[in-house]
């Protein structure tokens, strides 16, 4: 256990990306740009040990995955989809009916095409499809494309079922940096898209960073993280599994628990130690707990909030007797979960907001994915002659001050 000042003195995050990967990513992207599908099939064999004669999964296969899914899983995915859809519809920016006198305003248009990366790796993630494709669908994106790493037994049936529910247009079994390059450049089979979203490993994150500017991206994601503020009213057994739930994602997952009561933190520490040997996914959880788990003793409310805002975690959870004051004070987090019945895991699946959230302290300046990230926003300026005449002198004078005389002339010629 550390006191708040000790923690803050040593707190740092590793660079979110391993710079040594840069040459590898560059070479992969160039290979895909030049050789297209041939390169993708080669990388599937090299990295995923899977031979793929056909990169695209047919609509018949996608529908069959949904049709043959067990009813309980189907209902769970459907409920998640409905809640996500309803929430995103409620926050979607829309074009407003304007009075004729309004001369400056904004209009919104959906992106034309979006690529979604759905991780394979250590687990199957249909929730990633729901938390991304639903948003694109609500926005009105015309072409939604999913890429996901090939598996020896084929792409997860749950992932394909989620693609069916969200009306994804195309699904391709290709992953890693090569899939990001394919979505950026386009290949014989995979269409070029305008924006790529979705979480992935370091190769995926670095490819998104490398290709940003040629394609839009949501974020460059690092390891997942949660920070909790608790007091003596928190259910410590539940907190143990809030910690384990985050830790099981990745050996590098970070978990922080902040509290003003040192004894509560000690009790939690002993419960974690007792439960750890028998936890599912022990190999992953134990490494995360050993290397990336912190108990932090804060001296008061303000200090607890300061620690939370400094961490700026992807997920923040407040489980105290009176959580309301924290809602205003905790400012820099990806998502804020309040109370015993709002565990972070509910946000992973069915709460409604997307679980694609900023990591590595980027919550200090960016936000979680939403329907509005799949819209362009255009300003429209349509001035009357009267308004032009009221402001033209200022415009032409500023142009003169900046020595941009053709700018100035563009105004003057309209005044004459």
Swiss-Prot record:
Pfam families per record: Histidinol_dh
Positions annotated to bind NAD(+): 117, 178, 201
Superkingdom: Bacteria
Keyword presence, Oxidoreductase: yes
Any Gene Ontology CC annotation: cytosol
Family the UniProt entry places it in: Belongs to the histidinol dehydrogenase family.
Example of a GO biological process term: L-histidine biosynthetic process
Protein name: Histidinol dehydrogenase
Cofactor: Zn(2+)
Residues the entry annotates as binding substrate: 224, 246, 249, 315, 348, 402, 407
Active site residues according to the UniProt entry: 314 (proton acceptor), 315 (proton acceptor)
Annotated InterPro entries: Ald_DH/histidinol_DH, Histidinol_DH_CS, Histidinol_DH_monofunct, Hstdl_DH
Keyword Transferase assigned: no
GO MF term set: histidinol dehydrogenase activity; NAD binding; zinc ion binding
Pathway where it operates: Amino-acid biosynthesis; L-histidine biosynthesis; L-histidine from 5-phospho-alpha-D-ribose 1-diphosphate: step 9/9
Keyword terms of this UniProt record: Amino-acid biosynthesis, Histidine biosynthesis, Metal-binding, NAD, Oxidoreductase, Zinc
Task of the protein: Catalyzes the sequential NAD-dependent oxidations of L-histidinol to L-histidinaldehyde and then to L-histidine.
Organism field: Staphylococcus aureus (strain Mu50 / ATCC 700699)
Note on cofactor: Binds 1 zinc ion per subunit.
Annotated Zn(2+) binding sites: 246, 249, 348, 407
Catalytic activity, reaction form: L-histidinol + 2 NAD(+) + H2O = L-histidine + 2 NADH + 3 H(+)
EC number: 1.1.1.23
